UniProtKB/Swiss-Prot annotation:
GO cellular component, one term: plasma membrane
Encoding gene (name): alkB
Family: Belongs to the fatty acid desaturase type 1 family. AlkB subfamily.
GO biological process, one term: alkane catabolic process
Name of the protein: Alkane 1-monooxygenase
EC number(s) given by UniProt: 1.14.15.3
Binding-site list for Fe cation 1: H150, H154, H180, H184
Co-factor: note: Binds 2 Fe(3+) ions per subunit.
Keywords: Cell inner membrane, Cell membrane, Iron, Membrane, Metal-binding, Monooxygenase, Oxidoreductase, Transmembrane, Transmembrane helix
Pfam families noted in UniProt: FA_desaturase
Amino acid sequence: MNAPVHVDQNFEEVINAARSMREIDRKRYLWMISPALPVIGIGILAGYQFSPRPIKKIFALGGPIVLHIIIPVIDTIIGKDASNPTSEEIKQLENDPYYARLVKSFIPLQYIANVYACYLVSRKKTSFIDKILLGISMGAINGIAVNTAHELSHKADRLDHILSHLALVPTGYNHFRIEHPYGHHKRAATPEDPASSQMGETFYEFWPRTVFGSLKSAIEIETHRLKRKGKKFWSKDNELLQGWGMSAAFHSSIIAIFGKGTIPYLVTQAFYGISLFEIINYIEHYGLKRQKRADGNYERTMPEHSWNNNNIVTNLFLYQLQRHSDHHAYPTRPFQALRHFDEAPELPSGYASMLLPAMIPPLWFKMMDKRVFEHYKEDLTKANIYPKRRAKILAKFGLTDPNIENGK
């Protein structure tokens, strides 16, 4: 008689573990959507290359079409998920390497898409307008790549920091790796934070304030870090210089390989990518403010200091960035373990649906100012208000400035 066949014990344990994690996180395999974004980009580029001339420009603008139209529509149809993992499940999710591999897999695919785009842009038959449109499409991917860099920037491992810089290289926004974890997380939802928008501040006023303010902050942070180690800013250990060097090497290589004709494309994708990321920054803390304690320091960051949303599709694309309150409460907590808080202020829709309204100030103010007003129970003295429009905003809600009444 043949000996009974036994299933390999190790293999069975792996299968059981995978089944267990699938039960904990029912979206486990749907998270592949985020690293699949560059693959969608590659498909858009292939469509541009091989499509008939009359529809080439539709493919050239494929990135914004997906980002601003298709994703918001699907997001609205699919709806929300406010479920939370338990404390025990959070530990299991945090220790599962599957999720970290997903985040990192975005980066090589991002570079394949970028190189493919540069090849298309370098062809003589690619018009200047198409170079700009392709730059916008790739800017959408490289802008969302900043979110990949964001997830990696909070890790303690040096390799993760390098990978974070690699995701930022196409946009040249490498100072984000320094400023976000050590600057923004310290000052979030305060008037001093260049990355927190103020009530009544348009995105076009916020953009220069956050871009240049965050750059200045990153330089100050890295200068102080090096000084504590007895080193100067112009040191090989300066992480800012390392990141900028990586970006310079990438762009120089692209120009050397594909020619100067790629410059309009490179500038466009960087500008659009940076702007896309900063629109999300604009949304995240709009008008919200941490209050000062009796000792003059700000209260700790709480769930009520970030705008949140549970729309499933946008969360799948952005590693649950919309569960922003838990991210600020636990900055090193990986995306798969982030929780929803009932007390956190809620956006009217997902980030993807809010991008276009954020670029139209009257529409944005109509959608959001009332929410800030209601969040603070009609006490706008607690809100983070844009100084230039403070009196106008208070008057809009039938309020007066107590500082003016008191002669301050």
